[in-house]
């Protein structure tokens, strides 16, 4: 994946007319990913894939040397998805899923999802952020696979909550994550030294 210009993430996109969910991610071999990240991501994909109301597209990007490749083979992404299609399909996706990966970092996805103004279901955020993300305000936090399933069902049915999460995620991005806001925050911290 070669990341695209920020404008592509920030630009609005027409939503799908159906309950379409798109999600691709890397299958990681790092220890915390084997125990948590890969498990949550696979549960999300399988639940969405098997859900009668959802048209799911996606899967894992699995490197041949990944020791867990066989375990998740049924979720292997078939073919290549260009970054432009990844962005467009993520924007069309009714909801998105975030979980920290290697060393519990946020990775690209959290920032991408905020920039796109998506309704985000996420496992707990353990790292410091410029301002906390708040459950049911700008993110939907889950702690178990049962909570994950309930969150998916809730957000495909509760349009008002989903739209509120989308709008507040975009507002959070504009206030705290947009490049000019990050630079401003760094400059303010340097002045305080």
Predicted feature residues:
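Catalytic binding pocket for nucleotide-activated donors in carbohydrate/polymer assembly enzymes
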Residues: 69-78, 83-193
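Nucleotide-sugar donor-binding catalytic core of glycosyltransferases
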Residues: 1-107, 124-131
């Amino acid at each position: 994946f070669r990341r695209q210009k920020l404008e592509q993430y920030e630009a609005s996109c027409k939503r799908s007319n159906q309950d379409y969910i798109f999600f691709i991610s890397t299958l990681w071999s790092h220890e915390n990913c084997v125990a948590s990240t890969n498990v949550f991501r696979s549960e999300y994909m399988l639940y969405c894939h098997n859900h009668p109301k959802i048209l799911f597209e996606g899967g894992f990007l699995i490197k041949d040397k990944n020791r867990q490749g066989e375990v998740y083979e049924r979720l292997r992404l078939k073919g290549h998805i260009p970054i432009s299609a990844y962005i467009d399909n993520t924007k069309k996706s009714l909801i998105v899923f975030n979980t920290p990966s290697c060393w519990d970092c946020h990775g690209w996805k959290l920032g991408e999802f905020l920039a796109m103004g998506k309704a985000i279901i996420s496992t707990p955020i353990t790292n410091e952020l410029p301002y906390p993300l708040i459950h049911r305000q700008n993110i939907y936090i889950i702690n178990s696979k049962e909570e994950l399933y309930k969150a998916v069902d809730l957000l495909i049915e509760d349009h008002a909550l989903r739209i509120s999460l989308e709008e507040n995620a975009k507002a959070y991005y504009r206030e705290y994550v947009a490049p000019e806001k990050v630079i401003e925050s760094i400059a303010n911290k340097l002045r305080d030294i």
